[in-house]
Amino acid sequence: MANVYAAVAVTLVERLTEHIAARRERVRAYQQLLGQNESLKLIPHRLGSACLTQVVRVLPRKGSRDVAMEVVNALSAAGYKVHGSYLPLHLIPGLSACVWDRLPYADRIWSDLIELPCGPALGFDDLAKIATIVDAVATG
């Protein structure tokens, strides 16, 4: 069994450059399709990032609606698995001491962040459908 795991690991490493390039291509496509939407803020990747997703801040509107969750729900209804970007450690029950300074910006925006898929298996037709749904729901 160890040989099988080793073979899988070697294959993944051999294709790493190809996978990163494919992910970056999808990030560029999201930037082209969603970059002009004033209801969204695409979080840029740092130079050399191998991020698996495109993180997007869905800017809240006036009122109490959770627009980011509406985007996630609409994508889920269309068959796409998308979720919030992260939950700050200090907000997880039992980990409230995992913050050394207050994080007002993170505390304010974390619930607005979602991750859009960028994996090599994501076809550009699906990427365009995802972008269309995100655009429509975020714009309202």
Put a short name on every predicted segment.
Residues 1-140:
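PLP-dependent aminotransferase class I/II
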